[in-house]
Amino acid sequence: MEFGLSWIFLAAILKGVQCEVQLVESGGGLVKPGGSLRLSCAASGFTFSNAWMSWVRQAPGKGLEWVGRIKSKTDGGTTDYAAPVKGRFTISRDDSKNTLYLQMNSLKTEDTAVYYCTT
C-alpha cells in the first residue's frame, strides 16, 4: 500500500511542476528563387522576453542546420547568422506579442527546408 501511495504522490508532484512550452510556426509557402518569405513563431509557456531564440531548419534528407539566433533585449537583442544565410535572412522579435520572426529574402533552392524556432 505504501508503494502505491508513493507513486501517486510522485505523480502529483510531477503534475504540479509541468510546464507546457509551445512554439507554433506559421508563414511558410512556395516561392520562386529570388523571392521572399516571412515566418512567424508564436511562443507561450515561458518568459519569452528573457529567452534567446533561434531558428533551425531541416532540408529534405538532411540533418538539422542552425540558421541564426537573437538574444533577449536585456542581453542586447543582437543577432547572429549562419554563413549561408547571412545578409539574406533577418531575425527579429516582438516581445509584446511573444512572437519571433524570420524574414527570408533572395531565397535560393538550397533554402528549401522545414524551419523551426527553438529556445
From Swiss-Prot:
Q: Where is the signal peptide?
A: 1-19
Q: How does it assemble?
A: Immunoglobulins are composed of two identical heavy chains and two identical light chains; disulfide-linked.
Q: Tell me, what's a Pfam family for it?
A: V-set
**Looking at the record, which segments are called Complementarity-determining-3?**
118-119
| Disulfide bond positions | 41-117
Name it.
Immunoglobulin heavy variable 3-15
Q: Which organism is it from?
A: Homo sapiens
Region described as Framework-2: 53-69
Localization terms from the record: Secreted; Cell membrane
Region of interest (Framework-1), residue spans: 20-44
